[in-house]
Amino acid sequence: VWAVRGVFYRSDLGGYIDNVPGTLSLSPMSPSYPGPDTTYTEIDNAALVEDDFNDSSYQGFRLSSAMTLNDNWDLLITHIDQEINADGVFDYDPAVGDLEVKRFAPDTLEDAFTQTSMTLEGRMGTLDVLYTGSYLDRQVNQLVDYSGYGNVGNWLPYYICNYASATSPSYSACGNADVLVVLDDQNERTTHEFRIASNEMSELPFSYTAGVFIDESILKTINEYNYNGAASPEGGDSYAPYQVNCPIPGAWARDPSCRPITTRFYNDILRTEEQTSFFGEVTFPVTDKLDFMVGMRKYDMDIDFRGQSKFGFRGSNVSNGRDYDAGVHGTDLLNQSDTVTKFTASYKPDDDTLWYFTRSEGFRPGGWNRGGLLAPANPDFQSPPLTYGSDDTINTEIGVKTMLMDGSLRLNATWYNVEWTDIQVSRFDPVNVSI
């Protein structure tokens, strides 16, 4: 028996955020900037003003092929293809107006992925056998208005202002905060899972499930920060021109080409994660009405971080940056391993009622901090850690599922408590740790 199913779809969504007229210039009151004696250039967004500018569209398809190979084995293959295109932003600034923003550079998103998966399941005597695997390929390209960086960026004057003279460290004029970020992410992920489980033909006094899970993920990301509002990017007067921003020799780079002079900073990073997990659970029938289930998952993962953060400068100070393989990150993999457990007791006093208690552990993998161990501008602050560990949860749950009033009322009730420790948080602090 063979069956094929296809679903094709497209959805166009109108916007609801207005990009309204506005102007922007650097604030002479900011401690990062030269002060009121310096000339500041203003930027306006007249070319980008638009009502309901955050429209989007989704389109794609899903194809499935299911086949019964014989009395014991079935095969399912599925392929998904989807593309998202979106403009604008989906939040707003209450200080500007209800559902209104002032954006000074284009905001666009193109997000496309394909995923192919296969599931083979069957029976071998007293065992039910399952294999499932998938491959994901995703490409995301995005433009982001980064003009808000002008409010806090300590290094912005260096990039967009002019020195008063060749020997003076003060600035005579500053360009505008027209900063555009170009994001390019490539993500590949491959997963495999193989499991066996006892079935009703087993004569063992308990039932069980056991298996192995393998996960390999690759993320290649490029973020290019374009300072389009620089006062004199080509040089002029006593101010030396920008130099072409080229990759660090010997450092890992997905894109080995030199960037334009307006691309004053970029990240070209490779992150990989490989995980192998073994899992199993056993269910013991204590009585006809009471079952105990005990499970565990032992995982081991290697996490890698490579690449570079590249800065472009002026004059003889041609280039600088961070080669993460040669720096504190090194070439060693970050290894994390542990075992998490689960216990469930279930009690069925009758055919219509189930009481249960569960205690389970969970985790989220750790990783590398790109700005790890960098010295903050404020000496009272600590440097970010080089790596961060997994955060962990312990979940406790008590619940009941029952039918009442001769089956006319269903009741599901649960009490739960989650203890979450070593919580992972992110911090964007360009004033103290510029990454």
Q: Which role fits each region the language model picked out?
A:
Residues 52-58, 107-113, 175, 183-189, ...:
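Transmembrane beta-barrel outer-membrane domains
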Residues 119-124, 128-146, 348, 354-366, ...:
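Membrane-embedded beta-barrel scaffold of Gram-negative outer-membrane proteins
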Residues 11-16, 22, 58, 72, ...:
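Structural signature of outer-membrane beta-barrel domains
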Residues 61, 65-69, 337, 345-349:
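A structural motif corresponding to the C-terminal end of an alpha-helix
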Residues 16-51, 87-104, 145-182, 224-268, ...:
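Solvent-exposed loop segments that connect transmembrane elements
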Residues 1-86, 112-114, 187-188, 199, ...:
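Transmembrane beta-barrel wall of Gram-negative outer-membrane proteins
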Residues 78-80, 113-140, 176-313, 335, ...:
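Face-selective signature of the C-terminal outer-membrane beta-barrel domain
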